[in-house]
Curated annotation (Swiss-Prot):
<comment type="function">
    <text>Catalyzes the release of premature peptidyl moieties from peptidyl-tRNA molecules trapped in stalled 50S ribosomal subunits, and thus maintains levels of free tRNAs and 50S ribosomes.</text>
</comment>
<keyword id="KW-0694">RNA-binding</keyword>
<feature type="binding site">
    <location>
        <position position="66"/>
    </location>
    <ligand>
        <name>tRNA</name>
    </ligand>
</feature>
<keyword id="KW-0963">Cytoplasm</keyword>
<comment type="similarity">
    <text>Belongs to the PTH family.</text>
</comment>
<comment type="function">
    <text>Hydrolyzes ribosome-free peptidyl-tRNAs (with 1 or more amino acids incorporated), which drop off the ribosome during protein synthesis, or as a result of ribosome stalling.</text>
</comment>
<protein>
    <recommendedName>
        <fullName>Peptidyl-tRNA hydrolase</fullName>
        <ecNumber>3.1.1.29</ecNumber>
    </recommendedName>
</protein>
<feature type="binding site">
    <location>
        <position position="112"/>
    </location>
    <ligand>
        <name>tRNA</name>
    </ligand>
</feature>
<feature type="active site" description="Proton acceptor">
    <location>
        <position position="19"/>
    </location>
</feature>
<dbReference type="GO" id="GO:0006515">
    <property type="term" value="P:protein quality control for misfolded or incompletely synthesized proteins"/>
</dbReference>
<dbReference type="InterPro" id="IPR018171">
    <property type="entry name" value="Pept_tRNA_hydro_CS"/>
</dbReference>
<comment type="subunit">
    <text>Monomer.</text>
</comment>
<keyword id="KW-0378">Hydrolase</keyword>
<dbReference type="GO" id="GO:0005737">
    <property type="term" value="C:cytoplasm"/>
</dbReference>
<dbReference type="InterPro" id="IPR001328">
    <property type="entry name" value="Pept_tRNA_hydro"/>
</dbReference>
<dbReference type="InterPro" id="IPR036416">
    <property type="entry name" value="Pept_tRNA_hydro_sf"/>
</dbReference>
<feature type="site" description="Stabilizes the basic form of H active site to accept a proton">
    <location>
        <position position="91"/>
    </location>
</feature>
Length: 185
């Protein structure tokens, strides 16, 4: 079984913010594969189903970004999912908008959601799909930028990014990791 987690913040006011691109990707992935995100447990909204014939659980932690690990660890334990079968989708300030990149492991890089996951999983060696949101233009602060809604003129690029993320996450389920990185990076 695979676990695909999208990071974000719960609630209507955060729905279309840059920090919620992981949630948006999970919503679109669930829709594409007919998986209902209707199970609320372990401080997360989740749904189970099949992608490319493999069992998956899709997860949106409801703990707020900075505490994401509190939701993910119990889910992995409950379903007996190995760290190697986990993919985390999240926003990356240091990548241009529209770009996506798989990473096999790494530091938190200043991302508090990833920091929480590393703390609760006890390792930084979990797979990631980073979606670029870019750095804020001067004088906007990073904290304000990530919690800002996408502008209307940014929505076509966001939709393309989410479509690409769904394709990439779908491929994660049954594609060799090196082939996946070669294809998308």
């Amino acid at each position: 079984m695979k676990c695909i987690v999208g990071l974000g913040n719960p609630g209507k006011k955060f729905e279309m913010t840059r920090h919620n691109v992981g949630f948006l990707a999970i919503d679109r992935l669930a829709e594409k594969h007919g998986i209902s995100l209707n199970e609320a447990k372990f401080n997360a909204l989740m749904g189970t189903g099949r992608i490319n014939g493999e069992r998956v659980v899709l997860v949106k932690p409801l703990t707020y970004m900075n505490l994401s690990g509190e939701a993910v660890r119990p889910i992995l334990d409950y379903y007996k999912i190995e760290i190697d079968d986990l993919l985390v989708i999240y926003d990356d300030l240091d990548m241009v908008p529209g770009k996506l990149r798989f990473r096999p492991k790494g530091s938190a890089g200043g991302h508090n959601g990833i920091k929480s996951l590393i703390q609760h999983l006890g390792t930084a060696e979990f797979k990631r799909l980073k979606l670029g949101i870019g750095r804020p233009p001067h004088p906007i602060k990073v904290v304000d930028w990530v919690l800002m809604n996408y502008r209307k003129d940014e929505l076509p690029e966001l939709n393309e990014t989410l479509d690409n993320a769904v394709t990439a996450a779908t491929d994660f389920v049954d594609t060799d990791w090196l082939a996946l990185m070669n294809r998308y990076n």
